[in-house]
Amino acid sequence: LEAVPDTAEEVIAAIRAAGCQVGISIRPGTPVEAVFPYLGVVDLILVMSVEPGFGGQKFIPTTPTRIAAICAERTRRGCDTLIEVDGGINTETGPLCIAAGADWLVAGSSLFHAMDPAAVVNVLHSK
């Protein structure tokens, strides 16, 4: 959303015209209300739970509250936009995000640096 704040609607329309699904992302400092107008318009909202740029960062603890707010608004609007979370996802933070309403998780460092990656996937899938 931050990349094209003044032309988001045009970009969404162009992506749709190309026959593709549309997702938008928000950084940790962006108020979640900024994505509310796009619920039901885009297919996915990616909530960044770290500052974008590099892997291995610590999960920002306010992320579940942000997810819950988007989820509540999604329910209020009766739409099915997916909520995805990326950044600092592991076997502790992933379940918090799922409990808050996330549909998808992106697990990078915690998965690829694990002694048993399959065990990490199993824990995340079980929540």
Segment roles from a protein language model:
Residues 1-82:
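Conserved anion-binding
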Residues 9, 60, 95, 117-118:
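Conserved strand-to-helix beginnings and helix N-cap segments that scaffold or border functional pockets
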Residues 22, 104-105, 111:
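A short hydrophobic/small-residue beta-strand
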Residues 30-42, 87-105:
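Catalytic cores of alpha/beta
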Residues 45, 70, 86, 97, ...:
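Conserved, mostly hydrophobic/aromatic
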Residues 51-53, 88-91, 111-112:
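Short Gly/Pro-enriched loop/turn and capping motifs at secondary-structure junctions
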Residues 98, 110-127:
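C-terminal helical cap(s) of enzyme catalytic domains, especially alpha/beta-barrels
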